[in-house]
Structures are given as structure tokens and as C-alpha cells.
Amino acid sequence: MDIVTLAEVAGNLNVVGYGLAAIGPGIGLGILIGKTIESTARQPELGGRLQTLMFLGLAFVEVLALLGFVAAFIFQ
């Protein structure tokens, strides 16, 4: 392998790393939204409060994806 090929492979590893970093928040969002819907079905009177807490949790989970995205550029 020449140096150009190695540089191309090393550049593509950042993309793979971000793809793996995005899996965790994706799974977290699915679990969070699913449990909120399940809880609202069990206790409809708490729907508004559960929705507020869900959006707060969504913000925290999305921060993980953004950190992975930023890290891909920083460690490039």
C-alpha cells in the first residue's frame, strides 16, 4: 500500500466512528419515546408532564450524538 491509500483509509475511519457513535443515541431515543408512550397509555392524566420530561430527555440524548459529530471533526 502506498501512502495515499493509507491516508484515504484513515480519513474514512472518522466516518465509521461517527456512524458507531450515532447508534447509541438512536437506540436511546427509541427507548425513551417508546417508554413515554407506554407510560401515557397507562396513566393518561400524566401525559403533559411525561411529554415535558420526554423532551428534556431527548435533549440530553441528542447531546451525545452532537458530541460524537464534533469529536469526529476534532480528531480528524
Curated annotation (Swiss-Prot):
Family statement: Belongs to the ATPase C chain family.
Function: F(1)F(0) ATP synthase produces ATP from ADP in the presence of a proton or sodium gradient. F-type ATPases consist of two structural domains, F(1) containing the extramembraneous catalytic core and F(0) containing the membrane proton channel, linked together by a central stalk and a peripheral stalk. During catalysis, ATP synthesis in the catalytic domain of F(1) is coupled via a rotary mechanism of the central stalk subunits to proton translocation.
Keyword Transferase in record: no
Pfam families, sorted: ATP-synt_C (PF00137)
Keyword S-adenosyl-L-methionine found: no
PANTHER family hit by this protein: ATP SYNTHASE LIPID-BINDING PROTEIN, MITOCHONDRIAL, ATPASE PROTEIN 9
Subcellular location: Cell membrane
Tree of life domain: Bacteria
Membrane topology classification: Multi-pass membrane protein
Main location: membrane
NCBIfam families: ATP_synt_c (TIGR01260)
GO molecular function: lipid binding; proton-transporting ATP synthase activity, rotational mechanism
PROSITE patterns: ATPASE_C
Keywords from the named record: ATP synthesis, Cell membrane, CF(0), Hydrogen ion transport, Ion transport, Lipid-binding, Membrane, Transmembrane, Transmembrane helix, Transport
Record-level GO cellular component terms: plasma membrane; proton-transporting ATP synthase complex; proton-transporting two-sector ATPase complex, proton-transporting domain
Gene: atpE
Subunit structure, interactors included: F-type ATPases have 2 components, F(1) - the catalytic core - and F(0) - the membrane proton channel. F(1) has five subunits: alpha(3), beta(3), gamma(1), delta(1), epsilon(1). F(0) has three main subunits: a(1), b(2) and c(10-14). The alpha and beta chains form an alternating ring which encloses part of the gamma chain. F(1) is attached to F(0) by a central stalk formed by the gamma and epsilon chains, while a peripheral stalk is formed by the delta and b chains.
CDD domains documented for this protein: ATP-synt_Fo_c
Record-given protein name: ATP synthase subunit c
Annotated site residues (Reversibly protonated during proton transport) in this chain: 62
